[in-house]
Amino acid sequence: MTRAVGVGVLVLSLALTGCDGKKDKKRGKHKASSSHSRTAGGGTAGMGSLSAARRAEAILPPLDTMPAALRHVSTELHSRAKAPSVCKDPGGKCKGAVANGRVGYRSGDKAEGAGYDVIVYKNARAAERAFTVWQSYAQNNKHEVTVLQGPPHGDASLMYGYESPSRTNTLTMVIRQDQYIGTLDVRDASGALAARTDMKALSEVYAKRLVQATQDETPSATAAHVKV
């Protein structure tokens, strides 16, 4: 009788140990999974950076810093803690990106417009590589764009126009400043010459905002006094 009871206790003990072992294993697996999820969605871990997204948003000019003629919002000011969702023209510009932002403005009659984009890279070297991709795109796609002589800005800058008849009055300026690349698209239905004049004034202010961001200042440069 004693022997039977002892065997029963031993079997029960082993069974309980086995159950506990499985529970602990599952619990440990679940804990690891939860930890991974937090890391993947964190502000600085993984591919994005919330602090970089906040800097991107600060660089983009708000409505009250725009010229009086461009006080209609065409694209709401926003930023995201990730690379741009569309990585083309040029392809490869998203490599090393940790945040991006965009805003757009237009005139009341829609004849003029200005679109601002900014990409924040993990470091200045990544931004430099991305700018090289932009240069290659502009120089080697002559059927799409034409490199133009533009005002120098930042650590490096590039300006080009478009061959498409629907975009002949649009210019794009690309400005690299430390770990940032800002792009500015200016459109003026009056013609390419008017677009150049607008670009000169607006790009100067945008370049200042990029510089202020690299100096840990709150970007405050304004184009409110500019006539376009």
Regions found by a protein language model. Give the residues of each.
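Short, well-ordered beta-strand elements
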Residues: G115-D117, Q179-D188
